Amino acid sequence: FDYRCGYCRRSAPDLFAVRDESQAVKIIYKEFPILGDASRVAAVAALAAREQDLYEPFHEALMTQDIDFSQPSIMTLATEVGLDTDQLLDDMADPEIQEYLDRTYELARALGVNGTPAFIIDGVLYPGALSRADLEQLIAMSGG
């Protein structure tokens, strides 16, 4: 997903609802910032938030809040979810984050993902936005 992708943002609340309703569903988020520098800054900030154990709330805020995705607005949102922004900025400089994103790009290429959003359910790629009903149906069909 890309934090600035309108279709990703539209699918996010449905994805969160499905996640919250089923203990059997495991969601692995893969940041795939393809819509410019602001997308990359948001992805790096979200990944850096893992160091403060606040990835999930920050990820949800980035996906649902109406911000312009400038670094100042991302930092304001980070503060709102309880992140220490000085530490966040330090953690954003960690080269492991860029290595992680590089591996994600490689994985996307290998899987044939060339846009956002994309979902992989039980090993099958579903490109494009999915509604809650679509997600529930595909998960049920996979035995989940």
What is each of the regions a protein language model found here?
Residues 7, 13-16, 75-144:
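C-terminal cap of thioredoxin/glutaredoxin-like
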